[in-house]
Amino acid sequence: MTTTLANRPDGEGSVQVKLDPKVNIEEGALVIAVYGKGGIGKSTTSSNLSAAFSKLGKKVLQIGCDPKHDSTFTLTHKMVPTVIDILEEVDFHSEELRPQDFMFEGFNGVQCVESGGPPAGTGCGGYVTGQTVKLLKEHHLLEDTDVVIFDVLGDVVCGGFAAPLQHANYCLIVTANDFDSIFAMNRIVAAINAKAKNYKVRLGGVIANRSAELDQIEKFNEKTGLKTMAHFRNVDAIRRSRLKKCTIFEMDPEEEGVLEVQNEYLSLAKKMIDNVEPLEAEPLKDREIFDLLGFD
């Protein structure tokens, strides 16, 4: 993969990794990229959303795009090896690999892949994501998949970790009702708008996480054209599900808040299946966010 300033393939001023057309995900699958500020709960959200899609009868694949490779452990109940680690073992001869070497079945049949990434300060995470999709295509593992969810590292929107946007139909942004999360969300909106000039990705909406109220999020939504698709309060059962290494759907529905959270994830999955209307949002300038958020 190469990129040049002259072509600007992904928006004005872009130096992002350009998508190899041979690694496109097949038409027909609903492809979602989940972004948000680091530590906001993207992996929890992605895994529970994958589980919700599976409960609705969909064949789901979740791809973790973080070198920490901790995206899917609540689905698989274990830490699974990464694609990059497995490829290194065979000197990057992907033809020597079997699907079971890098894809693992999790809760309710959800298929799980951890792309991994290069050591800190080296290589390109976007290249690893591209190689993961290429490997899945070589083994015909995307042909019968209904939903693909990319769980993406932090709020990094460089050419590398913006790579999942090149495959996605929709981007969902996870945020809390606070300044830092919304500030990061604004940067992600700008990155998605740049990608949308040349790729099919569109904004799907906002997922409010660990937030009792929505006042600051709704202020931002009103100004930019975003919409809140789901709201998850700070329910302790979600925290405990991570410690139990399981999804919220494996928790006792009699426990406080569990059934409400399960229903909210199922509702979000249904909205996405029903062809959610893509949003036309415009990011704010940094000073505008600073002046917008907070209390009078």
Swiss-Prot record:
Superkingdom of the organism of origin: Bacteria
Binding site for [4Fe-4S] cluster: 124, 158
Cofactor binding notes: Binds 1 [4Fe-4S] cluster per dimer.
Cofactor(s), names only, from the UniProt record: [4Fe-4S] cluster
InterPro entries for this protein: NifH/chlL_CS, NifH/frxC, P-loop_NTPase, Protochlorophyllide_ATP-bd
Residues the record lists as binding ATP: 39-44, 68, 209-210
Enzyme class: oxidoreductase
Disulfide pairings: none
Residues that coordinate or bind Mg(2+): 43
GO biological process, one term: photosynthesis, dark reaction
EC number of this enzyme: 1.3.7.7
A single GO molecular function term of this UniProt record: ATP binding
Pathway: Porphyrin-containing compound metabolism; chlorophyll biosynthesis (light-independent)
Catalytic reactions of this protein: chlorophyllide a + oxidized 2[4Fe-4S]-[ferredoxin] + 2 ADP + 2 phosphate = protochlorophyllide a + reduced 2[4Fe-4S]-[ferredoxin] + 2 ATP + 2 H2O
Keyword terms of this UniProt record: 4Fe-4S, ATP-binding, Chlorophyll biosynthesis, Iron, Iron-sulfur, Magnesium, Metal-binding, Nucleotide-binding, Oxidoreductase, Photosynthesis
Protein purpose: Component of the dark-operative protochlorophyllide reductase (DPOR) that uses Mg-ATP and reduced ferredoxin to reduce ring D of protochlorophyllide (Pchlide) to form chlorophyllide a (Chlide). This reaction is light-independent. The L component serves as a unique electron donor to the NB-component of the complex, and binds Mg-ATP.
Self-association and partners: Homodimer. Protochlorophyllide reductase is composed of three subunits; ChlL, ChlN and ChlB.
Protein family per UniProt: Belongs to the NifH/BchL/ChlL family.
Official protein name in the record: Light-independent protochlorophyllide reductase iron-sulfur ATP-binding protein
Originating species: Prochlorococcus marinus (strain SARG / CCMP1375 / SS120)
Lineage: Bacteria, Bacillati, Cyanobacteriota, Cyanophyceae, Synechococcales
